[in-house]
Design a protein with these regions (language model features):
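Bacterial N-terminal signal peptides
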Residues: 10-20
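C-terminal PAP-associated
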Residues: 25-505
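Bacterial N-terminal signal peptides that target proteins for export
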Residues: 2-11
Length: 505
């Protein structure tokens, strides 16, 4: 597997100058605002449970891991899960569209849930509590403060459109939360992603026309983390946003892994898979988001540095469905136009590392199919591809990846699989830090699917989550969706954990 290790600083500087000219006038901001609602929730353990089942996973095989249990299942009218999950000190929280469930992270036993996503916001009195379009939720564990952070968007017909964010008051996910609701855009927010950096919580999201749901721009916002952790009132919790023009692709924020902070003064990195023909295809753009909470109007988002990627063709020809399934002519959305899952950062002391993935088309004599391409970047201020690889050992389609890296530099990628003979299921592959650059070990099956999605919508989750246990900093947790029987929207989810041999804590 080819590894690109030698992007020089001169090359990066030339790319930065050229690309900055091309992007002139296409970034708007800073746009400074503050929370519109602040309250404290009822304890999550006291919120009513829904009848929505957590299905048993008779199909799940035994793997060389720690945990492989059923997560939450589908709800009528909810076409896909967008499964998000994170481990805390003793618990694992999974979000799917519209509901939460809290598990014992060691046994998989349900502690609380399923709980309606908007019920945690019942004390807010705004659309975060009342809208039945509360979805696109994500969860993360802030390992620096030992608290949970949950978010979703509320998008009732006609607005207002709010980003609903909750920060737990302790490390117990079943307890109370500080509730903050933000109006980051006057239009429809779509597919928000949540990230941790020492100076802020960050959200990146697309902004759509409220009526047509057509893409208008992408947006990235900083939320005042220290104030939210302290539970201060809404008027004193600021937000700082930047947004691109309609011609700029989706922004994706970077989340800190581990306890080692970035070097002093290093700011949030924002990434963008840029496939615009007039800008030159196969670029990965990186920006630097500097927040100034003492004077928010002095905040900046600089860049991009344009990183030329090894040549590829987008999975599914950019945004078109193409993933086949057995027993139906319906094909699934492959999300080839964006980075999928989380983008995560680690400071190893002697170097800094960022990992990410997206879906491409791999063509061989056996034909074409969607495949996972993954990257490890070093020195993110002037990004250098340290290693990259493609996961495509056969003719099965692989897409919707989630990636993370442990404290030893081991990398794992989870993803969906499907083909005309393989039902949509879940697998993962690992790269130990001692393995040859760009190579993944033999993939492991988490769940063998036994059904196809037969709905004509063709949508599939655009998000799955690989995360790291904050206690040992080396146990991986992964959650994604699959089908056990053919139906229009009867998806199920799975939660699994595993370790590399280097993880001995």
């Amino acid at each position: 597997m080819k590894s690109l290790r030698n992007f020089s600083l001169a090359t990066a500087a030339t790319a930065l100058l050229a690309c900055s000219v091309a992007f002139a006038g296409e970034i708007e901001g800073p746009i400074v605002n503050h929370a519109v609602t602040h309250t404290v929730s009822r304890p999550m353990r006291e919120l009513p449970r829904l009848s929505r089942p957590s299905f048993q996973a008779a199909l799940a095989p035994t793997i060389s891991g720690l945990l492989n249990v059923a997560g939450q299942g589908s709800k009528p009218g909810v076409l896909y899960s967008d499964a998000s999950g994170a481990a805390g000190l003793t618990q694992y929280v999974q979000l799917v569209n519209n509901t939460y469930t809290i598990y014992d992270k060691s046994t998989g036993a349900v502690i609380a849930g399923p709980i309606a996503q908007n019920s945690l916001w019942s004390t807010s009195g705004d659309v975060c509590a009342t809208a039945n379009t509360s979805d696109d939720g994500t969860v993360m564990y802030d390992q620096l403060a030992n608290v949970w952070v949950l978010q979703h968007h509320a998008a009732p017909s006609g607005g207002p459109y709010l980003n609903c964010v909750a920060v737990s008051t302790s490390s117990d996910a079943t307890g109370t939360y500080y509730i903050y609701d933000f109006q980051l855009t006057m239009q429809f927010p779509d597919k928000p992603r949540l990230a941790l950096w020492p100076d802020a919580y960050y959200i990146s999201q697309d902004v759509l026309d409220p009526t047509t749901k057509v893409f208008q721009r992408s947006q990235v916002c900083a939320l005042q983390r220290d104030a939210m952790l302290a539970g201060v009132g809404n008027g004193n919790v600021n937000t700082i946003c930047f947004q691109g023009s309609i011609s700029l692709p989706t922004f994706v924020v970077t989340s800190l892994e581990g306890q080692t902070l970035p070097p002093a003064g290093e700011v949030e990195f924002v990434w963008q898979l840029d496939q615009r023909p007039n800008q030159g295809k196969n670029n990965l753009n990186s920006f630097q988001f500097h927040v100034d909470w003492s004077n928010p109007n002095n905040s900046t988002m600089t860049g991009p540095v344009a990183n030329l990627l090894p040549a590829y063709t987008d999975a599914c020809n950019n945004f078109k469905p193409c993933v086949p399934q057995p027993g139906t002519t319906n094909v699934l959305q492959g999300w080839g136009d964006r980075l999928t899952g989380r983008v995560t950062y680690r400071n190893f002391g002697t170097y800094e590392s960022v990992v990410m993935n997206h879906s491409i088309t791999r063509t061989t004599t056996a034909g074409s199919r969607a495949a996972i391409r993954w990257y490890e970047y070093r020195t993110p201020l002037t990004p250098v591809i340290f290693q990259t690889g493609v996961i495509s050992p056969d003719t099965t389609y692989r897409w919707n990846g989630g990636i993370a890296q442990d404290q030893f530099g081991d990398i794992a990628v989870g993803y969906n699989v499907s083909s005309s003979t393989v039902y949509p299921g879940i697998r993962y592959a690992g790269h130990a830090s001692t393995d040859k650059a760009g190579m993944m070990e033999t993939e492991i099956n988490l769940v063998t699917g036994a059904g196809s999605q037969t709905g004509t919508n063709k949508n599939w989750s655009s998000f799955s989550t690989m995360s790291i246990d904050p206690v040992d900093d080396c146990t991986f947790y992964y959650t994604n969706q699959y089908y056990a029987t053919s139906s229009q929207s009867g998806w199920k989810t799975q939660i699994a954990s595993f370790r590399f041999p280097s993880c001995t804590n």
